[in-house]
Structure formats: C-alpha cells, structure tokens
Amino acid sequence: MKRKLTICLLIALIFYNGNAKAAERGSLEELNDLSDTVFQMTRQAKYEEALQVLEYFEKTLKSAEKKQQDPMLTGAQIRQITLGYNDMVRSLKQADTSDTQKLRAAAQFRMLMDAVDNRSDPLWGSLEKPIMEAFTELKRDVQKNGSTSFHEKWNEFISLYDLIYPSLTIDVSEDQLETVGKHIDVIEQEEFQQMTESTKLERLSLLQHDLKNVFDRVEEDDADPSLLWVIITTGSIIITALTYVGYRKYKAEKNKLKKRDYPK
C-alpha cells in the first residue's frame, strides 16, 4: 500500500512539474512573440500601437512571474529585459528620437527576448557573418594605413556588436564578454593608432578569435529577413548617429551590478 502511495505521489509530482514547465515555456514564448509584434509595429511606424503592446508585455511579464512558484527568469535576465523594455518605451515616446533609432531599439529588444526564449539557435547568432566579415576589411585598412577608412569600418563593426550585445548578456558568460570588451577597449584607445602594423593586426586577430568563440556556442540558423532588412537599410545612418552608445551603457550596467541580483 505504501509503495503504491509513493508511486502515485511521484507520478503526481512529475505531472505537476511538467505542467509548470509547460506554463513557463508558454509565458516565455508569449513574451517573445510580443517583442516580435513590437518590432513589426515599429517597422511600420505604428508607434502608438507598439506602445500598447509594450504595456501588455509588462503586464504579462509581471503576471507570469507571480504565477510561477520557481522564478522562470533569473535576476540578471529580468534586469536586461527591464533595460531593453525601458529603452524601447523611451525611444518610442521621445519626439527627438528618429525613426531609425526607434527601429534599431526594436530590433535590439526583439533579439534580446529571443535570446531569453531560444537557447539553441538565437537570432543574434545569425549576424555572425556580417560581424566577422568586418575583420577582413579592418585588417586591409591597417595594411594600407588608411586611418579614416579604418575608423569608419570600426564604427560599423561596433554598431553591429551593439545591436546584439544585450542578447549576449543572456547567452554568453561574463568572462567571455569581459575578454571581448578588453580587446575593444584597447583598439579604441588613441595609442592603438601609434602601434606598429603587426601589433595592430595581432590585436584585431585576438578580438576576432574571441568573438568567433562567442558565435561558436550557437547553432547556425538562417537570419531573420526583417532584422537583416533593418541592418541593411539603417546601417549607414546609425554609424554616425549611434556608434557604440548602447554597448557602453549595457557594459557599464553589467559591471556596476554584476554581483547584485535584480530585486524581486
């Protein structure tokens, strides 16, 4: 009798855990879908509608957190989602924010939520090719001693890296991101231009190698055509307008609070 009771309890526990996991998966999937809706609304310049979806997104996130006995998101994930959400709302509400900046914020938020929901083949992984191909041109400019062209290509690279950086904080270890960040800091220093050609190429190769390691952790997947459209159509504009402001901000927030969990 005791054995039968134990078996029944185990089955009930397994069934409960299965339902909890399914509910958690459903909530994350819904949040991911909502971020895509925000992206599509922003792409069509339907900003009021996008804000309404974001309002529902916030309510859904809070509701999902309250319903789960075990938090479906870590404190770090909640913090990154909150940062992305606030950026998205702010960009849509500010009158002086250009359509390009709004669309970029939407693409960034879209990839962030996909990274939270999709751990095997996140959307940010599909941007490996344009990001890694930048090194060929950067090295070519170093060899030709074309400083102006190098800076343009570098800002282009940083602009793409900025686009996926929030997503990387979800999927990539802090140590890996810090290593990549240190390489970027070195190249951005004025002293970099005073280095010999061989040293510059070595620094670029180190960054290239560690970034390749970051991308190697995800499965290859086809790029989202909508996101590629954003990159292609806004690329030349965002280089000068945005450079790497977002990257700096997320990096500063990460370093500032890396040992403190987001309060619940």
From Swiss-Prot:
Which residues belong to the signal peptide in this entry? 1-22
Membrane topology, record value: Single-pass membrane protein
Q: What is its main location?
A: membrane
Query: Any transmembrane segments, and where?
Result: 227-247
Record localization: Membrane
Q: Coiled-coil region(s) at which residues?
A: none
User: Which InterPro entries does the entry mention?
Assistant: Spore_YpjB (IPR014231)
Q: Which GO terms describe its cellular component?
A: membrane
Alphabetically ordered keywords of this record: Membrane, Signal, Transmembrane, Transmembrane helix
Q: Pfam families from the xrefs?
A: Spore_YpjB (PF09577)
* Family matches, as NCBIfam families: spore_ypjB
- Protein name, as recorded: Uncharacterized protein YpjB
| Species assigned in the record | Bacillus subtilis (strain 168)
Which gene carries the instructions for this protein?
ypjB
